[in-house]
Amino acid sequence: DIDKHMLQILKDEVDNYKAAYNLVDFTDMIEKFNVSELCPKYDVVFIDEAQDLSPIQWKMYDILKKNSKHVILAGDDDQAIYGWAGADVQRFQDEPAKNIILPQSYRVPQAVQQIADQILNRIPDNRRIKKQWASRPEGGSVDHITSIEDVPLHEGDWLILARTNDKLIKLKSILKEMAIYFEIKGRKSYKTRLYTAVK
């Protein structure tokens, strides 16, 4: 576990490094914008994936909103995935605006929608915006797999997502046992030439 004191030390080190090499990161750019509040006038500002905005991004939005004729926020509170990084989905839900819910999805097939609805309907009404929408016309399919060994990983390319690095480490050892080539954060499980030769 890292406590606040250690985080502050790490932050100070990163800040010193950036200052020494005259570097600016994405957060620095937003903070500079927010402090200066120097903002051009816009006719329209369109912000996508607004459910995943962090508090400093919402402050930036407030400044843009004051300086724009029209602001469009596009997002879906059911797809909020950056709470761990400080995203404020409640702010998205509470934003006073005219809500337009798109009635049709061209991405989600019916089988996936049915399972998603089973999960989403368990969320209390005060925690999400209720919405009705139609799935893609094709039925699609959902496979219920209880073990990674049951996934045909030798066929085609796969992307495996895990909630934590700890889970990835466990998957890594399983994939090695199965002699499956993989990359995690750019690191190859074994040399590409060896993989090609074995394949």
Where do the PLM segments sit?
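Accessory N-terminal region flanking or inserted into the helicase ATPase core
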Residues: 1-46, 55-60, 73, 83
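Short, flexible, glycine/charge-rich loop motifs used to bind or transfer phosphoryl groups or to couple energy/partner
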Residues: 19, 31-40, 61-63, 89-92, ...
